[in-house]
Amino acid sequence: MKKIILVLVVAPLLSFSQSKNIYGEFNFGIAVLDGGAFPGASFLIGKTNYYENNTLLDYQAGIAFPTIVTGKLGFGWGDEDFATIIGFRVWPSCPYIQISIKERHNLSFEYHIKNSTDFGQAEALITYGYRF
């Protein structure tokens, strides 16, 4: 039932956007662990829909190291020059905030609520992404 409601809410948003941008993104970052840090990287394909009221919907999915797959969905404020996005990463599950500059440079901060993943006790994740 929750999935149906989500589809009914998101589907109209996807079709009435002012502009759309499909992109590839390379990300690299550091997971903050109990005993230090661990590097990671991902390659994602995503889409950003910009709306007339200065809001946006950004979603992406792809391959990652060490989690193999990843994806995230975010809602934000801004335009192609500067945007702030708040969302949720599907795997590993965690909320995030992302700052996007000129649609190309993205900095995200993610906090693991349960402090654990299949790969250990991760507290947070800090990433930089470059879109092309």
Q: Predicted segment positions?
A:
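N-terminal targeting signals for Sec/Tat export/insertion, comprising classic cleavable signal peptides
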Residues: 26-52
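Outer-membrane beta-barrel "beta-signal"
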Residues: 119-132
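Membrane-embedded beta-strands of outer-membrane beta-barrel proteins
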Residues: 43-45, 71-73, 95-99, 126-128
